[in-house]
Design a protein with these regions (language model features):
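Loop/turn-rich, solvent-exposed surfaces of beta-rich toroidal or solenoidal domains
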Residues: 246-311
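Beta-rich catalytic cores
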Residues: 17, 43-45, 89, 142, ...
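Asp-box/WD-like beta-propeller blade repeats and closely related beta-sheet repeat scaffolds
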Residues: 77-149
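A short beta-strand motif characteristic of beta-propeller blades
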Residues: 33-39, 78-84, 127-136, 182-189, ...
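Short loop/turn segments immediately following beta-strands, especially the blade-tip
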Residues: 24-30, 69-75, 114-124, 171-180, ...
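Short coil/turn segments that connect the beta-strands within blades of beta-propeller domains
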Residues: 1-2, 52-54, 98-100, 151-153, ...
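Conserved beta-strand positions in repeat-built beta-propeller and related beta-rich domains
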Residues: 6-9, 14-15, 58-62, 104-108, ...
Length: 347
């Protein structure tokens, strides 16, 4: 790892203390040194890096804006352009395998947007959209993620009902030429369970999804030939003694492909599950404190460590993760930054 890019919320409406998109250089001893804090628009809340590792793209939560940046030799960012896609509250962003288009999920917009990339890395026009219908005309189901399968041929997009729509996850085939998405399957969740995020296993056959209000993690088998999903298992993301909402937030498969982790915002905890190497089924291993408040996001770095962004305690906590036992052990490395909600590494 050379650099870390941290998206931080900035608005009073979000009770935020962040100041923008923060760039850190990761030093040889593992410490993080801030190099830049860039404010373009409010709430740079989620970001991704293109396939050539030359450009970074960021969505601005609660707004309708998406920004592009060139990554300089020293890791700092140069703003290229910001476009208005029209869909409110973009919450996730990713680049296709050909580096041709950018996909954005919008929550209140209920729509996935495909945006063309210009030759200079800036964002071009919206070339395709896919909207999740709601219960009535003019209403939508709120889309919360745009996750690729391992081969970047399909997008998995969780959506929530939030009264006017339907909680669900869809498998969508991506056409690289047109940028269009076409549905191949959908999973309809129980009312109020509210699917949030999913994570694909390295074998491209096992998919794990967390539900925000149901406080569950679900296991699916995925058939890439047909694009079909088969739901096989669900487990709680909190111990049986927890009776209140926990608000499951993020789900990841660890780099070894042996474990699934889920963060819980209201109990400030991390759930860890072991993956059966033959079947893909999960077995609960344990629950660990995240040592902060509201772990909205976490991710693994190339060094195998797990980094948890605690939004409401303004910290990123580094954990050593044991791929043999599944234990999360905090290191002494704590990064202080206002309202962190996304971390992206550049090696």
């Amino acid at each position: 790892m050379k650099y870390a890019y941290v998206g931080c919320r900035t608005t009073k409406q979000r009770n935020a203390r962040g100041e923008g998109l923060v760039v850190y250089e990761i030093m040889p001893d593992g410490s993080w040194k801030e190099k830049q804090c860039l404010f373009t628009e409010d709430n740079p809340s989620f970001q991704c890096i293109d396939q050539e590792k030359k450009y970074l793209y960021s969505v601005h939560g609660d707004l309708t804006l998406v920004s592009s940046y060139a990554i300089q030799e020293d890791g700092t960012l140069k703003h290229l352009n910001t476009i208005d896609i029209g869909g409110k509250n973009p919450v996730d962003i990713t680049v296709d395998k050909d580096n041709r288009n950018v996909i954005v999920a919008t929550l209140q917009g209920g729509t996935l947007y495909t945006i063309a990339r210009n030759a200079d890395g800036s964002l071009g026009e919206v070339i395709a959209t896919f909207t999740y219908e709601g219960k009535e005309e003019g209403k939508v189901s709120t889309v919360h993620q745009c996750l690729w399968d391992q081969k970047k041929n399909y997008i998995f997009a969780c959506a929530q009902g939030r009264i006017n729509g339907y909680g669900q996850m869809r498998a969508l085939k991506y056409d690289a030429t047109s940028g269009r998405l076409s549905e191949t399957d959908r999973f309809m969740a129980r009312t109020w369970d509210e699917p949030r995020h999913a994570a694909m296993h390295p074998n491209n056959r096992w998919l794990y999804m967390c539900e925000e209000k149901g406080d569950k993690v679900l296991y699916f088998q995925f058939d890439e030939a047909s694009g079909k999903l088969n739901a096989l298992q669900e487990l709680s993301t909190v111990p049986e003694t927890v009776t209140a909402y926990s608000d499951a937030s993020e789900v990841m498969v660890d780099p070894s492909g042996q474990w699934v982790l889920v963060s819980n915002r209201y109990t400030d905890s991390m759930a860890v599950y072991h993956i059966d190497p033959l079947t893909g089924y999960l077995k609960t291993t344990g629950f660990f404190p995240c040592l902060g408040k509201t772990p909205r996001f976490f991710t693994f770095a190339s060094n195998g460590k797990c980094y948890v962004a605690n939004e409401d305690s303004d910290t990123i906590i580094e954990f050593d993760f044991d791929p043999v036992t599944g234990q999360l052990v905090p290191s002494l490395n704590i990064i202080h930054t206002g309202s962190p909600v996304c971390i992206t590494f550049l090696d």
